[in-house]
Amino acid sequence: MVSEITHKSYPLHFVLFPFMAQGHMIPMVDIARLLAQRGVKITIVTTPHNAARFENVLSRAIESGLPISIVQVKLPSQEAGLPEGNETFDSLVSTKLLVPFFKAVNMLEEPVQKLFEEMSPQPSCIISDFCLPYTSKIAKKFNIPKILFHGMCCFCLLCMHVLRKNREILENLKSDKEHFVVPYFPDRVEFTRPQVPLATYVPGEWHEIKEDMVEADKTSYGVIVNTYQELEPAYANGYKEARSGKAWTIGPVSLCNKVGADKAERGNKADIDQDECLKWLDSKEEGSVLYVCLGSICSLPLSQLKELGLGLEESQRPFIWVVRGWEKNKELLEWFSESGFEERVKDRGLLIKGWSPQMLILAHHSVGGFLTHCGWNSTLEGITSGVPLLTWPLFGDQFCNQKLVVQVLKVGVSAGVEEVTNWGEEEKIGVLVDKEGVKKAVEELMGESDDAKEIRKRVKELGQLAHKAVEEGGSSHSNITSLLEDIMQLAQPNN
């Protein structure tokens, strides 16, 4: 066992740097716990507000004896021209704050350097989010290997790798509507230029920030990926080859959450009582409920949210609808009451205004479908729970994840969204799927057609394989062992 080797020969000390966004921090905290369970000393470096978000989960982990500590560094907001109170990416109210936010983040280099000079034992390895390129300078200065965490799947990472190597593909497209085929891929997959998370034109200061991230990616020792070999074998192998063998699939990391409290409190505290939510689910038939959640930074226009609501109503199926960023959606709240929507669906629709205990909901036997924005955390949690997916991608890696889910894995149905909804530009897009489209897609996913039955069968199988992957002897469990052995060799005092 690596945990025994770790203690007896040379104590490993990993320093983790999560990016300050909910979807990035959640898996990084899970990774911290997985490594600590193997006897690795873990130090998480983050800001006070972000540390508070995970206080309960980490306190339980520390009380159970796991060697985890948190070091807080103050974000230099004022010096970077960032208004106070914008310590997390998902709290930014305007795209104009993006550049000052990343400036503030990269200014953490100096205080973090001082921390490293005083750390004991000396760190053996850094695990850093892709969005924190300054950690490469720390790794170089202290001669420590840096492992990168992107928060994406191997399908998406390999797609980006191929397109970076063949930039002319995107550059030669005549318009943003034109489709292209990704070359050298195991499956035939088509995208438009905006659908891939690889910007061909980025203005001014934002371009420099992006280039720093790409450069830091190239110089990292390796990459850990929150996926499992059995889910996307051809893409996991292809990406590992692209990284000269230094890529480890260690997921689904969410499966380290064994107890109800940990499942319910990943990230922000849920805005619904856990028991109330489970009681509501218990009252529904097996596989009958559609769970609807479009992510932590989704703010679709009111016109689209109305169509989504009316489509859910007309589907005649029970549903849970999570509306996050609730304070931004006051008009929707008014529409719920004034139009009579909330009253009409009260017997079969549960509206959660804020944060939901997503893992608990997806694991419940009455849930038979998940309408998702295809963020990788949500996508993987759905598959791991054996729940078929109804895909509604918005931006970033989400169209890549949709292609994997619908075309390659065949565990979901597309809602029909083809156009990218960039953050801050939602109103320009308007309605992409009307109520009839929503109703049709729900029926396609949750009906009794042969295709729907096949999707349900396939996702159940992949869910079972996910649980096997993280058990002792499973692919992800073995990959963590391999990673630790690799770092242990590098960390020996005579190296």
Swiss-Prot record:
SUPFAM superfamilies: UDP-Glycosyltransferase/glycogen phosphorylase
Record Pfam families: UDPGT (PF00201)
Residue numbers annotated as active site: H24, D129
Gene3D superfamilies: Glycogen Phosphorylase B (3.40.50.2000)
Binding site for UDP-alpha-D-glucose: Q358, H373, W376, N377, S378, E381, D397, Q398
Keyword Glycosyltransferase: yes
Enzyme class: transferase
Any GO molecular function: UDP-glucosyltransferase activity
EC nos: 2.4.1.368
Keyword set, alphabetical order: Glycosyltransferase, Transferase
Record-level GO BP terms: saponin metabolic process
Binding-site list for an anthocyanidin: H24, G396
Catalytic reactions of this protein: oleanolate + UDP-alpha-D-glucose = oleanolate 3-O-beta-D-glucoside + UDP + H(+)
Entry superkingdom: Eukaryota
UniProt record similarity statement: Belongs to the UDP-glycosyltransferase family.
Functional note: The monoglucosylated hederagenin 3-O-beta-D-glucoside is a feeding deterrent of the yellow-striped flea beetle (Phyllotreta nemorum).
Name of the protein described by the UniProt record: UDP-glycosyltransferase 73C10
Gene name linked to the record: UGT73C10
